[in-house]
Design a protein with these regions (language model features):
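Hydrophobic face of amphipathic alpha-helices that form TPR/SEL1-like repeat modules
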Residues: 1-30
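Conserved C-terminal structural/oligomerization subdomain of aldehyde/semialdehyde dehydrogenase
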Residues: 31-37, 222, 259, 313, ...
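Residue-level signal for inorganic ion chemistry
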Residues: 32, 68, 90, 112, ...
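Glycine-rich loop-to-alpha-helix module at the N-terminal edge of alpha/beta enzyme cores
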Residues: 33-122, 133
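Short, well-ordered beta-strand elements within core beta-sheets of diverse protein domains
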Residues: 35-41, 56-62, 147-148, 258-261, ...
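Structural signal for hydrophobic packing residues in well-ordered secondary-structure cores
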Residues: 57, 61, 76-83, 87, ...
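Rossmann-like NAD(P) dinucleotide-binding subdomain of oxidoreductase/dehydrogenase enzymes
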Residues: 124-268, 322, 394
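ALDH superfamily catalytic-core signature
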Residues: 232-374, 403, 437
Length: 479
């Protein structure tokens, strides 16, 4: 039997061989086979990476922004050259279907190029003074050393979402990928190494959140920690960062409501909601997790939803190109979805499609629809993170908005209607960072991806995401 490849970390411009005894197996969720091993890194490894980033930061910040942008463009070009290789890694370690993996890789390169365009666009201000002969100058400065803690659901893109704005604005960064999907991050580090990015500007540490992640959040040399993951993990990161009053940027869970009005285009709504639920096997924090349908079209909508969900094909994405879903990421994720559905049934919900894990190898859960659901049920409040759609009927828009807002989460929401007045009323009433009207829940790189309530602090993308990596210095100049 062949020994799985053992990956090194990337610290201070070089790949570092792991001399520890503990390794973490990386498992293909479609087959349950071990495909690689990574170091079970410790706090000391994270400290070395942070120290390297600290040494590199002043010289990196001193470069003109346009020069920093040129390095980003080199990384983007390297990604495009290795796109097939990287997408194959994402499919293998994450269970993502081939088409979605290819889109993720292409979007990552485009995102880095987009952030590079901001080199000449972010700016300070000159403010009018009340004093004769005085100028008030407002500068936008880098934070210093930043860290990024990544999830497993869009692992490659999340490197760019944290790295690109950080580097463009003069910061250095230490990235920790999820231990479930580290192989694509190793490929990213190889590109960084091949283009000759200055040492210490980008570092990659491997390990678990409770060891490496905690050091990345709690080290006093870190100016900001950006983390994408669960609410529970975010709470730990925030508590650790608070000891040094370190800035945090957190994108956490979601329980996105989709509201379907009587006048909605039913075919459009069904397609968008199904696309938003089965993408990445339902493991997307901003996609529809609960559906509210106005009573006038409830039966018609539910029938079409059932037909569309039943038509969704799933299987091993390394072997099939005709599928919309692969497996869930691991056994724990599969068990969680099973438990959520079982509890909903205990509380009175009725399974009309799916509802049971697929027997055999791989962590597969079929597209599932729950009816006879009530707002107070746990399935309407707890994040499922699987291809499960609970459906609730409502009378009025006000009732739907009230139920949608009845959540600890506030990341995304959506509404389907052909009435502009209804859409505008919903926009004003929905308490979510993002609202999608008559479309699926996928954000744009020039927007701003930010959650309310327990869905996070701060945000990413566009001008406002870029400014998360900047701090303000005000100079009062008396002439």
């Amino acid at each position: 039997m062949s020994v799985p490849v053992q990956h090194p970390m990337y610290i201070d411009g070089q790949f570092v061989t792991w001399h520890g005894d503990a390794w973490i197996d990386v498992v293909n969720p479609a087959t349950e086979t071990v495909i690689s091993r990574i170091p079970d890194g410790q706090a000391e490894d994270a400290r070395k990476a942070i120290d390297a980033a600290e040494r590199a930061q002043p010289e990196w910040e001193a470069l003109p922004a346009i020069e920093r942008a040129s390095w980003l463009r080199k990384i983007a070009a390297g990604i495009r050259e290795r796109a097939s290789e990287i997408s194959a890694l994402i499919v293998e370690e994450g269970g993502k279907v081939q088409q979605l993996a290819e889109v993720e890789v292409a979007f990552t390169a485009d995102y880095i190029d987009y952030m590079a365009e901001w080199a000449r666009r972010y700016e300070g201000e000159i403010i009018q003074s009340d004093r004769p002969g005085e100028n008030i100058l407002l500068f936008k400065r880098a934070l210093g050393v930043t860290t990024g803690i990544l999830p497993w659901n869009f692992p490659f893109f999340l490197i760019a979402r944290k790295m690109a704005p950080a580097l463009l604005t003069g910061n250095t960064i230490v990235i920790k990928p999820s231990e479930f999907t580290p192989n694509n991050a190793i490929a990213f580090a190889k590109i960084v190494d091949e283009i000759g990015l200055p040492r210490g500007v980008f570092n990659l540490v491997l390990g678990r959140g409770e060891t490496v992640g905690q050091e990345l959040a709690g080290n006093p040399k870190v100016a900001m920690v950006s983390m994408t993951g669960s609410v529970a993990a975010g709470e730990k990161i925030m508590a650790t960062a608070a000891k040094n009053i370190t800035k945090v940027c957190l994108e956490l869970g979601g329980k996105a409501p989709a509201i379907v009005m009587d006048d909605a285009d039913i075919e459009l709504a069904v397609k968008a909601i199904v696309d938003s639920r089965v993408i990445n096997s339902g493991q997307v924090c901003n996609c529809a997790e609960r559906v509210y349908v106005q009573k006038g079209i409830y039966d018609q909508f539910v029938n079409r939803l059932g037909e569309a969900m039943q038509a969704v094909r799933f299987g091993n994405p390394s072997e099939r190109n005709d599928i919309a879903m692969g497996p869930l990421i691991n056994a724990a994720a599969l068990e969680k979805v099973e438990q959520k559905v079982a509890r909903a049934v205990e509380e009175g919900a009725r399974v009309v499609l799916g509802g049971k894990a697929v027997a055999g190898k791989g962590y597969y859960y079929p597209p599932t629809i729950l009816l006879d659901v009530r707002q107070e049920m746990s399935i309407m409040h707890e994040e499922t993170f699987g291809p499960v759609l609970p459906v609730v009927a409502f009378d009025t828009l006000e009732h739907a908005i009230s139920m949608a807002n009845d959540s600890d989460y506030g990341l995304t929401s959506s509404i389907y209607t052909q009435n502009l007045n209804v859409a505008m009323k919903a926009i004003k009433g929905l308490k979510f960072g993002e609202t999608y009207i008559n479309r699926e829940n996928f954000e744009a790189m020039q927007g701003f991806h930010a959650g309310w309530r327990k869905s996070g602090i701060g945000g990413a993308d566009g001008k406002h995401g870029l400014h998360e990596y900047l701090q303000t210095q005000v100079v009062y100049l008396q002439s």
